[in-house]
Amino acid sequence: YGAQPRLLGPKLNPNDLDEEGRLKAEATLIEAVDDAEYFGARGIAFLAGKWSEETKDEAYAQLLKTTVNVCRYAAMKNMNVELEIFDYDVDKAALIGPAPLAAKFAADVRSYCPNFGLLVDLSHFPICHESSADVIRTCRPYITHLHFGNAVADPEAKGYGDLHQRFGYPGSANDVQDL
Protein backbone atom coordinates (compact mmCIF):
# COMPACT_ATOMS: atom_id res chain seq x y z
CA TYR A 1 0.00 0.00 0.00
CA GLY A 2 1.60 3.24 -1.12
CA ALA A 3 1.19 5.76 1.69
CA GLN A 4 3.37 8.40 0.00
CA PRO A 5 0.37 10.47 -1.27
CA ARG A 6 -1.06 10.57 2.25
CA LEU A 7 2.06 12.50 3.29
CA LEU A 8 2.72 14.50 0.13
CA GLY A 9 -0.82 15.87 -0.38
CA PRO A 10 -1.21 17.52 3.03
CA LYS A 11 2.57 18.14 3.26
CA LEU A 12 3.05 15.97 6.34
CA ASN A 13 6.60 15.21 7.39
CA PRO A 14 7.48 12.07 9.38
CA ASN A 15 10.77 13.72 10.38
CA ASP A 16 9.17 17.04 11.31
CA LEU A 17 11.14 18.76 14.06
CA ASP A 18 7.86 20.07 15.44
CA GLU A 19 6.53 17.16 17.53
CA GLU A 20 2.91 18.00 16.74
CA GLY A 21 3.64 17.85 13.02
CA ARG A 22 5.56 14.59 13.40
CA LEU A 23 2.69 13.05 15.34
CA LYS A 24 0.24 14.02 12.57
CA ALA A 25 2.42 12.25 10.03
CA GLU A 26 2.73 9.21 12.31
CA ALA A 27 -1.05 9.05 12.81
CA THR A 28 -1.56 9.21 9.05
CA LEU A 29 0.87 6.34 8.53
CA ILE A 30 -0.85 4.27 11.21
CA GLU A 31 -4.17 4.92 9.43
CA ALA A 32 -2.45 3.77 6.24
CA VAL A 33 -1.54 0.49 7.94
CA ASP A 34 -5.21 0.01 8.81
CA ASP A 35 -6.26 0.82 5.23
CA ALA A 36 -3.64 -1.54 3.86
CA GLU A 37 -4.93 -4.31 6.09
CA TYR A 38 -8.51 -3.62 4.93
CA PHE A 39 -7.45 -3.91 1.28
CA GLY A 40 -5.47 -7.08 1.92
CA ALA A 41 -2.03 -5.53 1.42
CA ARG A 42 0.90 -6.97 3.34
CA GLY A 43 2.32 -3.61 4.34
CA ILE A 44 2.86 0.03 3.52
CA ALA A 45 5.53 2.15 1.88
CA PHE A 46 6.21 5.80 2.68
CA LEU A 47 8.91 8.42 2.24
CA ALA A 48 10.92 10.64 4.53
CA GLY A 49 10.13 14.33 4.67
CA LYS A 50 12.04 17.42 3.69
CA TRP A 51 15.08 18.41 5.71
CA SER A 52 17.85 20.98 6.08
CA GLU A 53 21.56 20.45 6.62
CA GLU A 54 21.51 22.38 9.91
CA THR A 55 18.98 20.03 11.51
CA LYS A 56 19.79 16.76 9.73
CA ASP A 57 20.61 14.81 12.91
CA GLU A 58 17.43 15.97 14.66
CA ALA A 59 15.34 15.12 11.59
CA TYR A 60 16.95 11.67 11.46
CA ALA A 61 16.01 11.05 15.11
CA GLN A 62 12.43 12.17 14.44
CA LEU A 63 12.16 9.89 11.40
CA LEU A 64 13.54 6.99 13.42
CA LYS A 65 10.93 7.59 16.14
CA THR A 66 8.08 7.72 13.61
CA THR A 67 9.27 4.67 11.70
CA VAL A 68 9.77 2.48 14.76
CA ASN A 69 6.31 3.40 16.07
CA VAL A 70 4.66 2.61 12.72
CA CYS A 71 6.63 -0.64 12.40
CA ARG A 72 5.58 -1.75 15.87
CA TYR A 73 1.94 -1.05 15.03
CA ALA A 74 2.24 -2.88 11.71
CA ALA A 75 3.92 -5.85 13.42
CA MET A 76 0.80 -6.36 15.54
CA LYS A 77 -1.03 -6.96 12.25
CA ASN A 78 1.78 -9.12 10.82
CA MET A 79 2.51 -6.40 8.25
CA ASN A 80 5.68 -4.80 6.89
CA VAL A 81 6.80 -1.20 6.51
CA GLU A 82 9.05 0.09 3.73
CA LEU A 83 10.74 3.45 3.37
CA GLU A 84 11.13 4.52 -0.24
CA ILE A 85 14.46 6.15 -1.01
CA PHE A 86 13.83 9.45 -2.81
CA ASP A 87 16.04 12.26 -4.04
CA TYR A 88 17.49 14.48 -1.34
CA ASP A 89 18.18 17.67 -3.30
CA VAL A 90 16.03 17.78 -6.44
CA ASP A 91 12.26 17.30 -6.32
CA LYS A 92 11.06 15.56 -3.16
CA ALA A 93 14.22 16.58 -1.25
CA ALA A 94 13.65 13.75 1.24
CA LEU A 95 16.01 13.08 4.12
CA ILE A 96 16.46 9.47 2.95
CA GLY A 97 18.06 10.15 0.29
CA PRO A 98 21.52 8.89 -0.34
CA ALA A 99 22.10 5.12 -0.23
CA PRO A 100 24.67 5.17 2.62
CA LEU A 101 22.25 7.10 4.84
CA ALA A 102 19.39 4.81 3.80
CA ALA A 103 21.40 1.71 4.75
CA LYS A 104 22.36 3.24 8.11
CA PHE A 105 18.74 4.17 8.76
CA ALA A 106 17.50 0.70 7.83
CA ALA A 107 20.05 -0.89 10.17
CA ASP A 108 18.95 1.42 12.97
CA VAL A 109 15.25 0.61 12.44
CA ARG A 110 15.91 -3.11 12.10
CA SER A 111 17.64 -3.11 15.48
CA TYR A 112 14.12 -2.53 16.85
CA CYS A 113 11.82 -3.86 14.13
CA PRO A 114 12.55 -6.77 11.77
CA ASN A 115 9.47 -5.93 9.66
CA PHE A 116 11.20 -2.90 8.09
CA GLY A 117 12.84 -2.64 4.69
CA LEU A 118 13.79 -0.25 1.91
CA LEU A 119 11.96 0.34 -1.34
CA VAL A 120 14.49 1.37 -3.99
CA ASP A 121 13.48 2.82 -7.33
CA LEU A 122 15.70 2.73 -10.42
CA SER A 123 14.31 6.14 -11.42
CA HIS A 124 15.65 7.72 -8.24
CA PHE A 125 19.26 6.58 -8.63
CA PRO A 126 20.29 9.17 -11.24
CA ILE A 127 18.61 12.06 -9.44
CA CYS A 128 20.33 10.93 -6.23
CA HIS A 129 23.65 11.14 -8.13
CA GLU A 130 24.22 7.40 -7.58
CA SER A 131 24.59 4.36 -9.80
CA SER A 132 22.29 1.36 -9.57
CA ALA A 133 25.27 -0.85 -8.70
CA ASP A 134 26.24 1.41 -5.79
CA VAL A 135 22.71 1.69 -4.40
CA ILE A 136 21.98 -2.02 -4.63
CA ARG A 137 25.37 -2.97 -3.19
CA THR A 138 25.01 -0.52 -0.30
CA CYS A 139 21.38 -1.23 0.55
CA ARG A 140 21.18 -4.90 -0.42
CA PRO A 141 20.62 -6.34 3.08
CA TYR A 142 17.61 -4.07 3.56
CA ILE A 143 15.95 -4.02 0.11
CA THR A 144 12.47 -5.52 0.28
CA HIS A 145 11.04 -3.91 -2.86
CA LEU A 146 12.70 -2.86 -6.11
CA HIS A 147 10.82 -0.61 -8.51
CA PHE A 148 11.91 -0.18 -12.12
CA GLY A 149 11.29 3.39 -13.26
CA ASN A 150 13.00 6.05 -15.32
CA ALA A 151 13.94 9.71 -14.85
CA VAL A 152 15.59 12.61 -16.63
CA ALA A 153 18.52 13.80 -14.52
CA ASP A 154 19.58 16.81 -16.61
CA PRO A 155 17.82 19.95 -15.30
CA GLU A 156 18.02 21.51 -18.77
CA ALA A 157 16.36 18.57 -20.54
CA LYS A 158 12.70 18.21 -21.45
CA GLY A 159 10.90 16.05 -18.89
CA TYR A 160 13.40 16.75 -16.09
CA GLY A 161 12.75 14.88 -12.87
CA ASP A 162 11.20 11.71 -11.55
CA LEU A 163 8.29 11.49 -13.98
CA HIS A 164 8.69 7.77 -14.76
CA GLN A 165 9.23 8.34 -18.45
CA ARG A 166 9.33 5.25 -20.64
CA PHE A 167 12.66 3.45 -20.88
CA GLY A 168 14.75 4.99 -23.63
CA TYR A 169 12.97 8.36 -23.39
CA PRO A 170 15.25 11.01 -24.99
CA GLY A 171 17.67 12.36 -22.40
CA SER A 172 16.57 9.93 -19.73
CA ALA A 173 18.93 8.06 -17.44
CA ASN A 174 17.65 4.51 -17.81
CA ASP A 175 17.06 2.25 -20.79
CA VAL A 176 16.31 -1.40 -21.35
CA GLN A 177 19.96 -2.43 -20.83
CA ASP A 178 19.85 -0.87 -17.35
CA LEU A 179 17.18 -3.35 -16.34
Residue ranges and their predicted role:
Residues 11-117, 127:
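Active-site acidic/histidine proton-transfer and metal-coordination neighborhood
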Residues 40-41, 100-117, 126-179:
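Histidine-acidic metal/acid-base catalytic patches
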Residues 5-11, 46, 154-159:
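Short acidic/His/Gly/Ser-rich catalytic and metal-binding motifs that mark active-site loops
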